């Protein structure tokens, strides 16, 4: 069964600019792809320099005024404003600059900082490792990990040796989850759940949101030992140490704790191969009682294999960097793994989330 919270149609961008993924590609769209890395650097620079906040607070500034406010030399200011206007992030009329409508609206919401955290993740976690994307495809492995200092077997076991990257990573993961877990809280019926196991729960962002929305549940977070102190800190800050506990361990090599009637994988199964996902889901199946449920919550690509575009672009990171496998898999790929793990396809439920991120949930019952 599929539940769609919002139907959207992807078509040609009437204002020009990046291709939307459905209309025929023209030369302007191809040029956007060719110079896409440069377009992102304009976005990142504008975020780090707080250009957008400046124009939110002082709309209509002139070029010299913006340069003075940002402390930029004339040439540097010319470059920044050329890029910001050419990409459509700003508009200029009679020499006065304004925010694009989409940015002006986003800045009014709590999602603005989450968006900026996503920009920081792309800059400080993804960018360097994605240089090795082609070689990662050739070798079918995450070659970009070689650019991250440390000896851990994957990115997650190296983050603690790279403080700036670690900070950017966990800020992003919290923000990326928050962009979607408001919908998770709305649609996920946990009335029949008493104890939830959050596998790879990171800094507890999803367990905290679900516990706050469902006062009757308790949660355990299975997380690797280097991350466990951060997890415990976030739980304590939320005042939920009496209801959420950390279970240090490795979900691949350790047995799952028992006594839970729901197992959740949030933003985890995009990291590993389908075979590894099947093994994890089988461990969840074995740990669950009859009637217990498994929840897969992360970004999804469509079953046709042609989008959404954010799912496609996000897959570059998963191919090149974190672990030796992973991408934004399709709904059907997860359902195949669930079936191989022992779950009955007749129990599967798809929930497609609204918004610009391609998030969704699959629920299966033992």
Curated annotation (Swiss-Prot):
UniProt feature, compositional bias: Polar residues: 1-12
Binding site for S-adenosyl-L-methionine: 223
Enzyme class, broadest EC rank: transferase
GO biological process: antibiotic biosynthetic process; methylation
Keywords: Antibiotic biosynthesis, Methyltransferase, S-adenosyl-L-methionine, Transferase
Location of region: Disordered: 1-22
EC number(s) reported in the record: 2.1.1.304
Domain of life of the organism encoding this protein: Bacteria
GO MF term list: O-methyltransferase activity; protein dimerization activity
Pfam families: Dimerisation (PF08100), Methyltransf_2 (PF00891)
Family the entry assigns: Belongs to the class I-like SAM-binding methyltransferase superfamily. Cation-independent O-methyltransferase family.
Family annotation (PANTHER family): O-METHYLTRANSFERASE
Protein name (record): L-tyrosine C(3)-methyltransferase
Organism: Streptomyces lavendulae
